[in-house]
Amino acid sequence: MKTTDDFFIPDNEIRLVKELDYSCVNEYIDSAEAFSRASYQSVYIIDYFKHNFLYVSPNPMFLCGLSPEHVKELGYRFYLDCVPENEQSLLLMLNKAGFSFYNELPVIDRKKWYISYDFHILNDGRKILVNHKLTPLALTSDGRIWLALCVVSAATHTDAGHIEMHRADSSEYYVYNVVSRKWHKREMPMLTSGEKSVLSLSIQGYTMAEIAEKNMSVTRYDKKISPTHLR
């Protein structure tokens, strides 16, 4: 039977405890609250020393019908109570793979990276697929993550997985193969100005017919763009 302790492994253990300054955590919480107010996405902060959630936003995407206070109180127990049992092993696998990858990076670059993956959460017995991104918020001097910012939104895929490591200033990223247990380098495709125009209009909520009216050349681009971007 899985327990919350399974999420805490040597690769995410805090070693330099004396460096932790809890007098500054309110600044991180205030920043997360400000981001939450301006976004539909759910936001929360993980404390890898105390093994709990430091903050949980009121945005409903991640709450599974619970209050933010309840989710905060649950902490890592949330993943065991609100994630389907057959996907909990996936979370443990990507947790191990992600930290193993992360600890190979130069310390100076670690805040530039984030991990992204999809999994289901349960709300009144109904499965909802979400995308989950995690990025370092505060590090110890040896590069260990003390606090991490997590952002949860609706997934654009149709199944769980899709584990990726991205660097904010690079078009290169890494995809984790759950069968071979290896990371594979990929390159983000470069969009033309026409493709960017189509995506921009789609994000604004225009339908394909409306986009076609605004851009008669849309048919040249729509085959190159993932259907998940066009709704």
Task: For each feature predicted by the language model, list its residue ranges.
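Short, low-complexity N-terminal regulatory "tails/caps" that precede and couple sensory modules
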Residues: M1-L20
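Short, structured secondary-structure boundary patches
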Residues: L16, L90-L94, R231
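Charge-dense, low-complexity intrinsically disordered segments
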Residues: E19, E85, K185, P189
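PAS-family sensory domain signal
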Residues: L20-F78, D169-W183
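Short, flexible, glycine/charge-rich loop motifs used to bind or transfer phosphoryl groups or to couple energy/partner
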Residues: A32-A34, I108, E187-M188
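Sensory/regulatory domains in signal-transduction proteins
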Residues: I46-E69, L74-G161
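Juxtadomain coupling helices with adjacent low-complexity linkers
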Residues: A154-W183, M188
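Helix-turn-helix DNA-binding segment
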Residues: V178-R231
